[in-house]
């Protein structure tokens, strides 16, 4: 047992040393490492001699490496959304005018209120950008609590297996955490004011019906949609290796 433990510790130290080196090098170049680069580093490690291919030692050490890779990937996703224009400047996740008031907004734009429409859209995205850092703790907790079976499922799953895992495990809790903070942020950045201004100017116009919208719910859900989309895009970087490499990694870990 002592020999096995020693070999496992040495293997873990090698993984951590590789990751530390990648992180230090990336810091020097002002860039975070990609998930792909970390997984390639782990892939190059020799198989554990303590239990052969697919041993518990292999699974634990490589599992730790996958967790670290996911930690880096989710951090990159959160950081990219947290900056100025993280949502607003990214067409894939930009929060657009809600469908329920889009007709009102279209009419408003055509009759001189484009400024109010633009302010409303911008303020929703600014609120999402301000709230995005909240997700970091939830990702960290989910990664920490991953079981070996969770890691196995992510390794053998589809292109967004980890993202699906996070969404299933976290979305409800994230919604609960995000909504009150976003409600506050929406008010701070003027989304509610812009919305009321936009709707208020047209609610008495004969050809426009008064519309209603749970703005906090809308912005919260759209913020989370954008968050998981971005994590999914980051995860796909893991899956871009040639099939042989992926198979080699799976053989190293699971003996397949």
Predicted segment positions?
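Mid-length scaffold segments of soluble, non-membrane domains
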Residues: 112-185
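An amphipathic alpha-helical core segment
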Residues: 181-222
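Sec/Tat signal peptide C-region and signal peptidase I cleavage site
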Residues: 26-30
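Residue-level signature of catalytic and energy-coupling elements of molecular machines
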Residues: 77, 147, 242
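Short, Lys/Arg-enriched N-terminal segments with co-localized hydrophobic residues
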Residues: 1-11
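Sec-dependent N-terminal signal peptides
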Residues: 15-24
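N-terminal Sec/ER secretory leader and immediately downstream segment
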Residues: 33-121
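A cross-kingdom marker for long, charged
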Residues: 34-47, 216, 223-256
